[in-house]
Regions:
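Small-residue helix-packing motif on alpha-helices
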Residues: 38, 56, 72, 192-200, ...
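NAD(P)+-binding Rossmann beta1-loop-alpha1 motif at the extreme N-terminus of oxidoreductases
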Residues: 1-59, 103, 123-124, 185-189
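NAD(P)-dependent Rossmann-like dehydrogenase/reductase catalytic/cofactor-binding core
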Residues: 201-266
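A short glycine-threonine-serine/GTX helix/turn-capping micro-motif
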Residues: 165-173, 223
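Rossmann-like NAD(P)(H) cofactor-binding subdomain of soluble oxidoreductases
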Residues: 20, 29, 45, 53-128
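Glycine-rich beta-alpha junction loops
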Residues: 34, 93-95, 115-119, 168, ...
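Internal alpha-helical scaffold of NAD(P)-dependent oxidoreductase catalytic cores
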Residues: 99-109, 125-164, 175-214, 259-260
Length: 266
């Protein structure tokens, strides 16, 4: 039995712990200053709470650093004497692999990951950076298998993490922004808030499911399948084009990417 430990058990750390807990041959432990967080995870996935960060480092085979970026240095330096033979994983945005290795005194291999919030419901995407030259093939296979089992996972060089961050890490914020707009227009059209919200969410989920179930069909074809010549749907699509919706979405992600590059600069 292998042990996966997380220092930080908030939304993202908790989501990953919950996913790992479902896998065979893994048990989960964690520490968070907020006892309510570890209590909730104990009920949800059987997490065993630790008294502090050092206990996690001592007992876990794989240690997830799931704290805010400004706290990473202090946490990693604190547990550094206990990392021999361990595998360190960091999800802190903007904290480079080089910095993680420096904080740990290069006492163990490290992996940088970039998940997104749908991981909280088992529908996440995750980028893995396996650039650390001290990672052996067995460790790479272990971490890739682990995260592939709980999310849609891609392996990227660290230089490409900002692209993933802007596109996929921040992507849920943009989807929810669009979802809010659909709910708002539902209200304007006379639906109750409950119905507008429920229908808008199902619209998003159902449309994506249709695309996933028909991988050979281009998205443009699926769009045109909704639009009849001279009908109302094509008028709406043309209005989106007139307003530059496609370009606005592209520029939104590119602006996010520029900021992600700034944050990743050492």
């Amino acid at each position: 039995m292998l042990t996966f430990g997380s220092i930080g058990c908030g939304n993202m750390g908790g989501a990953i712990l919950s996913g790992v807990a479902k896998l065979e041959k893994w048990q989960v432990i964690g520490f968070d200053p907020c006892q309510a967080a570890t209590d909730a995870l104990h009920e949800r996935c059987g997490l065993r709470a630790c008294d502090d960060e050092i206990e996690v480092a001592q007992q876990a085979d794989v240690i997830l650093i799931a704290v805010k970026p400004q706290h990473v240095q202090g946490v990693v330096e604190k547990i550094a004497p206990h990392l021999d033979g361990k595998l360190l994983v960091s999800l802190a945005a903007g904290v480079s692999l080089r910095r993680i290795k420096t904080y740990s005194g290069d006492t163990c291999p490290a992996v940088v990951i970039m998940p997104n919030t749908p991981a909280m419901v088992g529908e996440g995407c995750c980028a893995l950076c396996l650039d650390d030259p001290t990672l052996n093939e067995e460790q790479k296979k272990l971490v890739l298998g682990l995260f592939s089992a709980i999310s849609t996972t891609v392996v990227l060089h660290e230089s490409h993490i900002p692209e993933f961050s802007a596109f996929i890490g921040s992507g849920p914020a943009f989807i929810f922004h669009l979802l809010e707009s659909f709910v708002e227009v539902g209200l304007r059209l006379g639906f109750s808030y409950h119905d507008a919200k429920q229908l808008a969410e199902k619209l998003m989920v159902g449309s994506v499911r249709l695309a996933q179930e028909n991988p050979e069909v281009p998205h443009a074809k699926l769009r045109m399948n909704v639009c009849s010549p001279g009908g109302s749907s094509i008028v709406g699509v043309n209005e989106m084009d007139r307003l530059g919706v496609r370009g606005a979405i592209i520029e939104t992600v590119l602006a996010t990417h520029r900021r992600a590059l700034e944050m990743s600069a050492d």
